[in-house]
Structure formats: structure tokens, C-alpha cells
């Protein structure tokens, strides 16, 4: 029997509320700054009461972009969505098929191939990124959606998670499919894929946010302003040297950039949690 301790309940709830406040307060300050004009943002101290310029600030960056040499912000959002969705679809497809082959196909050195994939997790991004840029440049894929997305579609982490889940499926499923005369791809499409839906949901959320938050890769690959992404665009809004940063516009851009991943997480929240639990079994 679990002993009821009121003081422990009060303490845990207090810490939870404090944690939520610490997380939400910066977002509230960003929201307030997004509703102010330029003069009010630079007032010391800045007011914590929302202003009346939110729609004006949104319209300004939505139409005019985030700088003097910038695409409209709606275009950046579209580029980020195309990049994130393409990376997500590619990662899931490549990882599922590679894990399926490693688990159920019997071929020489299959475990060696898996560990060769897995060991790439130990290589820092800085070690891999410049050779990858060189390859993309040689393939003439700079300033293109293909250059933005293709190099990021392979994932050792996703392959590992799918492999662990596939190994929990009983061998009787394979035998039953073989007796029925099902081909490997028929077995994959009719049995393995439907059983992997919760894992797919979890990896969809993770990989979408991963693709959406990319900063360094677009910065190295893209010079065409019409292919710019939101994260790199926000960084470009912050002035250097003697320039002045329009922090109200920066905060508007940041809040608009937050909306798609937040919506994805909220919509797929339950499936995301189930997928993580199933992957750990």
C-alpha cells in the first residue's frame, strides 16, 4: 500500500509549477515583444503587457521578409516544411527498409553492416558535414531542395529503433507468411508496416522536428534567398556590428516558426508516447 504524504504532493506540484513557469516565461516575453513597436521593445525596462502591433509585425515579415535581401517569410516557412517533410519521409523509408533487411534477410556480414551503420552515431557532425558538402557540390546540388534533403535522409538512430522493434515480432509471423506464399515485400507491406504504426508516429515527430530545426546545413548549402529556411532566416535578422536588430520582428518570426512543430507534437502526442514505449520493449 502506498502511503499518502500530503507534503510530498505539495512539494512535487510546486516544483512542477515552477518548472512550467521557467519554461513559459521566456515565451511570454517573446510574445509581448512581438506585439510591440520598435521603440517600445527598446524601452528599459520593456513592458510585460502585450501591445497592439502584433498583426502589423506579422504582415511586415510575412510580405517583406526578415531583411533587406530576404524572401517573404511565408516562402521560408514553405521551404522549411518541404525540407522537414522530405527528410522525415526519407528517413522513415530508408530506416524501415534497412532494418527490415537486417532482421529478416539472411546474408553474409549482415550484423557487420548494422554496426557500420550504428557506429556513425559516434562521429561528430563537424567530422561528417564538410565531406558531405563537398559531395553535394560535386554533384551540382547546391541551392536545391535535393541538396537540402537527400544527405539528411539516412539515420542510424531510426534504423536502430526499427531493428529493435522488428526483433520483438514473433518468428511465427514470418513462417505463416512464407507458408501463404507471400513475398518479402508483401510481408513487409501487409504485416510489418501496420504493426509499426506507433513507431512510425514517434519517429515522424522526432525527425520532423530535426528537419525543421536545421540551421547549419541550409547555411552551408543555400545561397539563393528564395530557398532560405526560417531558422537560418531568424539568425540573419540579428544585426552585427553597428546595426540595429528589430527584436519585435525577430520575436514574431520565432513565434511563427514554433507553430508547425508544436502542432505536430500536440496532434501526435499519444501515438508519439506509445511509439517510444513500444521501441523500448
Swiss-Prot record:
UniProt-recorded Gene Ontology molecular function terms: glycerol-3-phosphate transmembrane transporter activity
Tagged with keyword Transmembrane: yes
TM stretches of this protein: 16-36, 85-105, 113-133, 142-162, 202-222, 247-267
Pfam families xref list: BPD_transp_1
UniProt KW Transmembrane helix keyword: yes
Biological process according to GO: glycerol-3-phosphate transmembrane transport
Entry-linked Gene3D superfamilies: MetI-like
UniProt domain ABC transmembrane type-1: residue ranges: 77-268
Disruption phenotype: Mutant lacking this gene fails to grow on both glycerol-3-phosphate and glycerol-2-phosphate.
Signals that turn on the gene: Induced by phosphate starvation, via PhoB. Also induced by carbon starvation, via the cAMP receptor protein (CRP).
Membrane topology: Multi-pass membrane protein
Localization per record: Cell inner membrane
GO CC annotations, alphabetized: ATP-binding cassette (ABC) transporter complex, substrate-binding subunit-containing; glycerol-3-phosphate-transporting ATPase complex; membrane; plasma membrane
UniProt KW keywords: Cell inner membrane, Cell membrane, Membrane, Transmembrane, Transmembrane helix, Transport
Top-rank taxon: Bacteria
Database matches in InterPro entries: MetI-like, MetI-like_sf
NCBIfam families associated with the record: PRK10973.1 (NF008210)
Physiological role: Part of the ABC transporter complex UgpBAEC involved in sn-glycerol-3-phosphate (G3P) import. Probably responsible for the translocation of the substrate across the membrane. Can also transport glycerophosphoryl diesters, which are hydrolyzed to G3P and alcohol during transport. The G3P moiety can be detected in the cytoplasm whereas the corresponding alcohol is usually found in the culture medium.
Similarity field: Belongs to the binding-protein-dependent transport system permease family. UgpAE subfamily.
Subunit structure: The complex is composed of two ATP-binding proteins (UgpC), two transmembrane proteins (UgpA and UgpE) and a solute-binding protein (UgpB).
Protein name, per record: sn-glycerol-3-phosphate transport system permease protein UgpE
Organism: Escherichia coli (strain K12)
Amino acid at each position: 500500500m502506498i502511503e499518502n504524504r500530503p507534503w510530498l504532493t505539495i512539494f512535487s506540484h510546486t516544483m512542477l509549477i515552477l518548472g512550467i513557469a521557467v519554461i513559459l516565461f521566456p515565451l511570454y516575453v517573446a510574445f509581448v515583444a512581438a506585439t510591440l513597436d520598435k521603440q517600445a521593445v527598446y524601452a528599459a525596462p520593456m513592458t510585460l503587457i502585450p501591445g497592439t502591433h502584433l498583426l502589423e509585425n506579422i504582415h511586415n515579415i510575412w510580405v517583406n521578409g526578415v531583411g533587406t535581401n530576404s524572401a517573404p517569410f511565408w516562402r521560408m516557412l514553405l521551404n522549411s516544411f518541404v525540407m522537414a517533410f522530405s527528410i522525415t519521409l526519407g528517413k522513415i523509408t530508408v530506416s524501415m527498409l534497412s532494418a527490415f533487411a537486417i532482421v529478416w534477410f539472411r546474408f553474409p556480414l549482415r550484423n557487420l553492416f548494422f554496426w557500420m551503420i550504428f557506429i556513425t552515431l559516434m562521429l561528430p557532425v563537424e567530422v561528417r558535414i564538410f565531406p558531405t558538402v563537398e559531395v553535394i557540390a560535386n554533384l551540382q546540388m547546391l541551392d536545391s531542395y535535393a541538396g537540402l534533403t537527400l544527405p539528411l535522409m539516412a539515420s542510424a538512430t531510426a534504423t536502430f529503433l526499427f531493428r529493435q522493434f522488428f526483433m520483438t515480432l514473433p518468428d511465427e509471423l514470418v513462417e505463416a507468411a512464407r507458408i501463404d506464399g507471400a513475398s518479402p515485400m508483401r510481408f513487409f507491406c501487409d504485416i510489418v508496416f501496420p504493426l509499426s504504426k506507433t513507431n512510425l508516429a514517434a519517429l515522424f515527430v522526432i525527425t520532423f522536428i530535426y528537419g525543421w530545426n536545421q540551421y547549419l546545413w541550409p547555411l552551408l548549402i543555400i545561397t539563393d534567398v528564395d530557398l532560405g529556411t526560417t531558422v537560418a532566416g531568424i539568425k540573419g535578422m540579428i544585426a552585427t556590428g553597428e546595426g540595429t536588430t528589430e527584436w519585435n520582428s525577430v520575436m514574431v518570426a520565432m513565434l511563427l516558426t514554433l507553430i508547425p512543430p508544436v502542432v505536430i507534437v500536440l496532434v501526435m502526442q499519444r501515438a508519439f508516447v506509445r511509439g517510444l514505449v513500444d521501441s523500448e520493449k
